[in-house]
Amino acid sequence: IAVPAFGPSLLFGLGEGAVLPIIPLMARDLGASVPMAALVVALISIGSLLNNIPASLITMRWGERGAIVAAGLWSGLGLALCVLTSHLALFATGCLMVGMSQAVYNLARQIYMTEAVPIAYRARALSTLGGVMRIGMFIGPFLGAAAIHAFGLQAAFGVGIAGVLGAAAIGARVPDLETPPTPPGQTPPAATTIVSTLRDHRHVFLTLGLGVVLVSAVRASRQVVIPLWADHLALAPAVASLVYGLAGGIDMLVFYPAGKVMDHKGRRWVAVPSMLIMGMAMLWMPFTSGFNTLLLASLSIGFGNGIGSGMIMTLGADHSPRHGRAHFLGVWRLMSDIGSSCGPVLLSFLAGSLSLAAGIAATGLIAFAAAGALAYWIPKTHGSERS
């Protein structure tokens, strides 16, 4: 069961992790300036952001298995375009395609696990799903580095293509979920649309959904905060990388216990502490003055983020209706991606206009606001599966 359920996520994360550190270097080799190379990298996030709603339509049309296979093939095609072209515009197009495939894959996997796993095990399943993908993203750069050492810079894309195509191959063997028949005497529910989903579930989107936006902003900012503050402290790049890697290691160790707590105690018991821990660590970071204190703050951020693995997916699954689930989760993931895009932008703005310390502290305050929103809006029951 574990291989078809989590194998595609491990391979998909591994494939993307292998190429992400190389994309800006390849863009520079193709003549991009430093700002242009950063924009090319950002196209992956932009592609995911823009494709969340179309991803829901693709999943409803082709089913979860078809969407997983299509996402792997589309990502492989995008990576192949990146490695075969000598034109920056086509390279950027390939990166956009990778981001688009992310949206389809992540949505299809979330829907599949939501419907296939009993609600009593939902948080553990979705936390493991998120954790396994993080493990793949962690392993990918090492495999990419080994390939580069042996065969050159472009070899990392070979690892990436193998990973996403392997995910598609395993995904093709995942059994389709059967749609429950309409009980005798009942009229089949009317077809849902994005507009009807926004209308019918606007209260959830405008309350808990805004909390999810804040959570995503904090999570995305953490990836920038640690290396920037390490540079501010004049630590060597290798030391900064070590701190970042250790924080990522803590992140990966705690996802399953956190999911078990969510299943047994309720979502609040993990969601709120996750944001409080990250908020306190963010507020502490500007007061760190060297390797030891920076490492402790970074490990705290990693722990807080790790216990929240799968939290956004679980909350979305809890509130999604059985009928029209793809539309609901497409909007849910769109809100999450909006937060992920805005968090680093706000940090950059505050760092430029005030100081880096002010930007990091503001991110910590956003984490506290997210904790308050989650504490207030998450239902007290363990789940809220809706018919």
Map each language-model feature to its residues.
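Helix-to-loop junctions at the C-terminal end of transmembrane segments
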Residues: 51-63, 254-266
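Structural signature of the two symmetry-related core transmembrane helices
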Residues: 67-80, 161, 269-283
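Helix-breaking motifs and short loop linkers at transmembrane-helix boundaries and internal kinks
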Residues: 63, 84-89, 266, 288-289
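Juxtamembrane intracellular "pre-TM" segments in multi-pass secondary transporters
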Residues: 176-208
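Helix-loop boundary and gating motifs at the non-cytosolic
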Residues: 1-42, 207, 219-229, 233
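C-terminal membrane-cytosol helix-exit motif in multi-pass small-molecule transporters
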Residues: 162-183, 370-378
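Cytoplasmic helix-loop-helix junction between adjacent transmembrane helices
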Residues: 96-133
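Core transmembrane helices of Major Facilitator Superfamily
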Residues: 16, 97-109, 300-312
